[in-house]
């Protein structure tokens, strides 16, 4: 279970 906000995809 991830307890961190989703990381946006890099451009």
UniProtKB/Swiss-Prot annotation:
Expressed by the venom gland. Signal peptide: none annotated. One of its GO terms (molecular function) is peptidase inhibitor activity. It comes from the Eukaryota. GO terms for biological process: regulation of blood pressure. It is found in: Secreted. The modification Pyrrolidone carboxylic acid is found at residue 1. Keywords: Hypotensive agent, Metalloenzyme inhibitor, Metalloprotease inhibitor, Protease inhibitor, Pyrrolidone carboxylic acid, Secreted, Toxin. GO terms for cellular component: extracellular region. Belongs to the bradykinin-potentiating peptide family. This peptide both inhibits the activity of the angiotensin-converting enzyme (ACE) and enhances the action of bradykinin by inhibiting the peptidases that inactivate it. It acts as an indirect hypotensive agent. This is Bradykinin-potentiating peptide 11j. It comes from Bothrops jararaca.
């Amino acid at each position: 279970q991830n307890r961190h906000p989703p990381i946006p995809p890099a451009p």
